[in-house]
Amino acid sequence: MFLRKRTSRYTGDCSAKAKTADVDNLNRADDFGGKSMMDNVCLNKINIVKEKLEQADAVVIGAGAGLSTAAGFTYSGERFDRYFSDFAEKYGFKDMYSGGFYDFDTLEEYWAYWSRYVYVNRYMNPPSPLYDNIFELVKNKDYFVLTTNVDHCFQKAGFDKERLYYTQGDYGLFQCSKPCHDSTYDNEDIIRKKLLSQGFKISEEHENSEKAGKTGTALVKPQNTQIKLTIPSELVPRCPRCGRPMSMNLRADNTFVQDDGWYRAADRYGKFMENHRGQKLLFLELGVGYNTPGIIKYNFWRYAANWKNAFYVCINKGEAYVPEDIAEKAVGVNEDIAVVVDELKAL
């Protein structure tokens, strides 16, 4: 059974072009060692990916958190310091993710934090054009995207929203916290109001090389302005039906709302897969780890094992694993996704 814990791991970096090599030999190449050889092995794999992409009747992209990280959407470091240094100083957490679980004393503080979190990760584009470059690779193919990411970078890069299935929610949606009903609500307007109430400006200009989002733009701290860590009580979002506080539409527990849009996307994905059964189907997995492997990774392995004309690609620096059972119809590239995509565009 291919779900046994038998995997092949690929190591080595990429720096130049190379000719296509036999997949099975490449999947065992790391037994030989040597940096220059590893470079050639990695680049040969990229050539195979390019070849399979060109030959494919359709492409299914499976995207995890590692893809947005490769695009520059980091939750710590400079981005965190730029937008959350005041929260960090007061509460002691060191990254956005940790702050998202902090038990704030008031809803006014909670939503001050989350309005920043949502805006910089949902309504601003990532610092690099990685998603745009991926779109260039597949825009003329019959494609579908399955993703556990909630930042909507695919749609911002030009991917058809009818070909996207966001399984875990969307930073751009609110829901009732109970929930008392299965509807979600766009939050961009109210998020902007929360930010303005804290003293931020929303500028059309780029800030510190982080390019503005297509819907609206960069978040700026005006000079000589004291940014507030709270919002007015009237800006705390409440359910229009029961009056309870709203929450983010993120799959954190059993209160997650799967609205009509979620089910329509799931149905479109299912039909896409059924319509392409038996065709040359490329499963392109990008930045998927092991937090929720059953959504993308394990399903892609099953399809590769059971569908004769399927081919599986895993690109993920440090986690490019392929089950031995499908090693002859799969390839793993242990390299930064942005580097690989640039190589693919250059071929």
State where each predicted segment sits:
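Conserved catalytic alpha/beta core of Sir2/sirtuin-type deacylases, generalized to analogous enzyme cores
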Residues: 2-14, 19-347
